[in-house]
From Swiss-Prot:
Pfam families: Dala_Dala_lig_C (PF07478), Dala_Dala_lig_N (PF01820)
Any one of the GO CC terms: cytosol
Classification of source organism: Bacteria, Bacillati, Cyanobacteriota, Cyanophyceae, Synechococcales
Keyword terms, alphabetized: ATP-binding, Cell shape, Cell wall biogenesis/degradation, Cytoplasm, Ligase, Magnesium, Manganese, Metal-binding, Nucleotide-binding, Peptidoglycan synthesis
Primary residence: cytoplasm
Top-tier EC class: ligase
EC number: 6.3.2.4
HAMAP family reported for this sequence: Dala_Dala_lig
Name of the molecule in the record: D-alanine--D-alanine ligase
InterPro entries xrefs: ATP-grasp, ATP_grasp_subdomain_1, D-Ala_lig_Van_CS, D_ala_D_ala, Dala_Dala_lig_C, Dala_Dala_lig_N, PreATP-grasp_dom_sf
Gene name of the record: ddl
Function as written in the Swiss-Prot or TrEMBL entry: Cell wall formation.
Residues noted as binding Mg(2+) 2 in the record, renumbered to the chain: E309, N311
Amino acid sequence: MAAQKVGLLFGGRSGEHEVSIRSAAAIASALADPSNRDRYQVLPFYIDKEGGWHSGETAAQVLANQKPLFVEEPSDRWQFPADCRDVEVWFPILHGPNGEDGTIQGLLTLMQRPFVGSGVLGSALGMDKIAMKQAFAQASLPQVAYVAVNRSQVFSDPCRYTSLLEQIETELGYPCFVKPANLGSSVGIAKVRDRAELEAALDQAAALDRRLIIEAAIDNPREVECAVLGNDYPQASILGEITYDSDFYDYETKYTDGKAQLLIPAQLSAELQQKLQELAIAAFQAVDASGLSRLDFFLDSQGQIFINEINTLPGFTALSMYPQLWAASGVAFPDLVHRLIQLALER
């Protein structure tokens, strides 16, 4: 049987461009593994920071160097490489806005080719934290209290703005977290302890996104993650825990070597682990996810569980939590990539 042509799509216009390149390089290496070499042929497609598409040698060079392409003159963003037609199944590994929010998934759907990961609905719900929480609430999943805010409320007349501040203080209190609803990698998130910090954080978040979410803080929570794999009958991995010395798991902590430690497996009772796995699958199904997702949870000092979020297209470097959780669960990286492609073809 001829090798299937896999369109490996990476880069993108989000702030997670470099992470996407590293994820794609790891996936390309897994597809070159002896177990996959005869099954798949990789066709790399790179989207530069201006939105231009590149294929062939240019995309392969970015993949090999693991460095973004410097574009002197933006290419025609409406012109897709001709070899897109050769792709039999797509593996998009674009992180952040335009990559995991349903945008690229809609384009691939129009191309009438199968692709790895969630469809338009699951991706959109997984990206927008407000819509995500509404879906979780519908499924009766445990969450911290939150207030949803539009940018217009932040930049409104003083009376309405003061009313918003009072609502947040009454319903959530301090400390609390202010987050843009549609940005990944903890970008724009701030922990606030008084009204002055709240106002500054709202201004910062509203400059980044039209939709904001403010969440009640949990005192010194444990942060536990679970990987999910599958379509209609998903499976959950063992659990992992993230530990760090900073005030919360912010962008700097997430992407600076040595600032955070991954503990796999997490030290949890068998009963608690089973409960978290069940909740991970329930959350996966609540947003109509498919293929893969990583579920993030908080545990308070009493052992109470709160679901934080779902990431429908998690980091995929060899050091990322998602593949590490599956490796610890007995699924090696090359086999994980193979399974994801097969799940795309089955859907």
